């Protein structure tokens, strides 16, 4: 594994209209980095949440990145090489369709994944997906 990830969710009890956040505390291994959003074509570390009819996603909150200099290519790109936190904000919709979907089951499953490509100073490794899921109680 190229990094360690600890996930948490702000609440496991949901009601229509409630806002939630999923936090991903990421620590790259020594000499490793992952790509941050920026002006490059590398695979950015990304939060993907499986679509649900009762869920609205906000853009992922990314912390400030560092510039990594690839000496062999004389290329500078935005990366994370130190511990950082990604936060995915979500809203449980308060619509008739959302209420109907939420009424069918409790607990409900919120699932997704963290996708990234890790590199060290010599090699970029195959893209990786780390699945995450939470059981949410509907009130």
Give names to the regions the model predicted.
Residues 1-139:
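Extracellular/lumen-exposed scaffold segments
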